[in-house]
């Protein structure tokens, strides 16, 4: 089930959606468009996190999975608009050498690799929290409902964060936007560790994190587009997203190992602070100017 879920998640991931949107939007609108796409995913998290939490209590996890499967199937008819080229005014030219050369050149680009490392940290952070936040809430003696609503608030706050990040892409250098986001995560986690563990602490923590949660996607995708153009944006951003998912695996898995060894997540929180600070610094040397400029017809 995990393997099939991963395939499905990859097939409708941000890289595919942002690549499709980039070829349908003028350059000045792509940042806002990516923010809207990202906000849509966050709205789904806000709506479904408490609903699924209740469904698990009522019908168990299997019944909840069936409910999510039905909702997912309802999205299939919407794909017709994405697979049609009739509304794609931007037609990027094929660079010499095609996809293979584009990927090869990208993987030798230091700025692209630095972007991967920063996004790796984002995945580590998000997967750790999504997987282990309910246990952390339980360790603090609070109801599981607090965890469900915290995840919902993360999704709600990320709608605002994603739209704001999409707008910032057109106003500021994307690498600075990312540096601020990653740095703010380190500060927020440090404040959480110092605060008393009440339900309102978790709610405030969730809102703060939600503002940067997946709001990193618009500036990250924008950087890939600035570096290499939009012709292979879906593929090149997909490779960046792969590092995000590797970080996610380690965040979830290592969180479990740390909990089994210590019965708390203290070491993971400090590791998360260190990685977030590192990600903020890693983005600063990125050369944001277009290195490969692909012509748009």
Region spans (language model):
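Hydrophobic core of transmembrane alpha-helices in multi-pass small-molecule transporters
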Residues: 1-12, 120, 201-215
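Intracellular juxtamembrane helix-capping segments at the cytosolic ends
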Residues: 11-25, 215-228
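A late C-terminal transmembrane helix in Major Facilitator Superfamily
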Residues: 36, 45, 227-262
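Helix-loop-helix hairpin linking two adjacent transmembrane segments in secondary transporters
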Residues: 37-85
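Interfacial helix-cap and linker-helix signal at transmembrane-aqueous boundaries
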Residues: 50-59, 137-138, 168-169, 254-263
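Flexible cytoplasmic inter-helical loops of multi-pass small-molecule transporters
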Residues: 81-101, 292-297
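Extracytoplasmic gate region of multi-pass secondary transporters
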Residues: 109-163
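C-terminal transmembrane helical hairpin of 12-TM major facilitator-type secondary transporters
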Residues: 146, 154-158, 164, 169-223
């Amino acid at each position: 089930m995990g393997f099939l879920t991963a395939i499905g998640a990859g097939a409708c991931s941000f890289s595919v959606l942002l690549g499709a949107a980039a070829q349908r939007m003028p350059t000045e609108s792509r940042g806002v468009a990516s923010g809207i796409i990202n906000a849509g995913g966050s709205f789904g998290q806000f709506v479904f996190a408490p609903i699924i939490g209740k469904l698990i209590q009522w019908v168990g996890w299997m019944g909840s999975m069936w409910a999510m499967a039905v909702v997912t199937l309802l999205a299939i008819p919407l794909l017709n608009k994405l697979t049609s080229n009739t509304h794609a005014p931007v037609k990027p030219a094929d660079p010499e050498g095609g996809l293979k050369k584009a990927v090869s050149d990208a993987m030798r680009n230091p700025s692209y690799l630095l972007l991967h490392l920063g996004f790796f940290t984002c995945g580590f952070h998000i997967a750790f929290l999504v997987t282990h936040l309910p246990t952390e809430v339980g360790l603090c003696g609070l109801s599981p409902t607090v965890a469900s609503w915290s995840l919902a608030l993360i999704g709600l706050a990320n709608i605002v964060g994603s739209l704001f990040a999409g707008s910032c892409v057109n106003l500021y250098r994307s690498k600075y936007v990312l540096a601020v986001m990653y740095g703010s995560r380190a500060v927020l986690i440090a404040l959480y560790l110092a605060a008393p563990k009440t339900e309102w602490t978790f709610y405030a923590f969730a809102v703060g994190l939600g503002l940067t949660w997946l709001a990193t996607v618009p500036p990250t995708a924008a950087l890939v587009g600035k570096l290499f153009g939009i012709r292979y944006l879906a593929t090149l951003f997909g490779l960046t997203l792969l590092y995000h998912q590797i970080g996610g695996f380690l965040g979830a898995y290592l969180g479990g190992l740390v909990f089994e060894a210590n019965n708390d997540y203290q070491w993971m929180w400090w590791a998360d602070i260190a990685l977030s600070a590192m990600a903020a610094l890693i983005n600063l040397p990125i050369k944001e100017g277009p290195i490969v400029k692909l012509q748009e017809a």
